Amino acid sequence: MTEETSQSPVIAIVGPTASGKSTLGIEVALQLNGEIINCDSVQVYQEIQVATAKVPLEERNGIPHHLIDFVPPSINYTAVEWAREAAKKIEEIESRGRVPLLVGGTGFYLRALRNPFFISPQTDESLRLRLNTMREQRGAEYLHRVLRRLDRRAAAQLYPRDWPRVQRAIEVYLQTGRSIVDQKDERPEAHESSRRLRILALNPPRAELYERINQRTEDHFEAGLVAEVQYLLSRGVPPNSNALGAHGYRRVVEYLEGKRDLPGAIEQTKLDVRHYAKRQLTWFRHEAGVEWFDGFGEEKNVLAAVLTALAGGPPSK
């Protein structure tokens, strides 16, 4: 028996933003003697709090949380870096006789962990949006100059006006630290992940999810989101950083730059987050072996269904 087949799959609790993943993760951890590894690309950053839905310390019920609040907001943290750290944390948690639980909605992170030698050409949402804005404001040739500074080999193979491939090459390099030239012949099936994942996904009613997103967005602005962005900018965090490219933060930056009014920033943020939730659901529906649970993570029947599945259900293939 190989090491991989002898080990239990690592549990991942995923779903769209505002679906109650964090609450469900804590409840499952309490039942399984678990510790949580954050799998959200925004919650890794220090100093950004208001719009990140990080669970406050006093609400974690004593459950240790890892890979949260540990990256300076001026640093563009990649999926590859997260996957390496997550793999280490999984081993550390298991060495203590406890159960690691991956909790979050960043599918790209999970894919990087599942396939440590392959990163899909898809990228995280904030990076793609920033590159789109860069191209719209400065043109495709500027984007090609950016690629040339990052990855001369890829730039030499692409025409400046072929912006979709230029942008893809930038995304791959920033996410993996490797040239797309080195990755273009790789396929996910060519590599085996060192650990299997058992992915449990929340599927709340769409209309209720969107209502929750709209209300949470308004709550974030009322809780001081604009002041938080002003503070981060005053600390020298670049406005085009991954941290400030996150949903909510990006539109506030535009508001502070005079590109839109505050009501417009709020409404656009609601739309952005609703679209993002839809894309998250689409992403996980395309992942193999995902087990779906209808409802929000705070619902007792959802917790009961998840615990029942974990007690006797088969792992994802």
Question: Language-model features: where?
Answer:
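Phosphate/pyrophosphate-binding catalytic cores of soluble transferases and nucleic-acid-acting enzymes
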Residues: 1-317
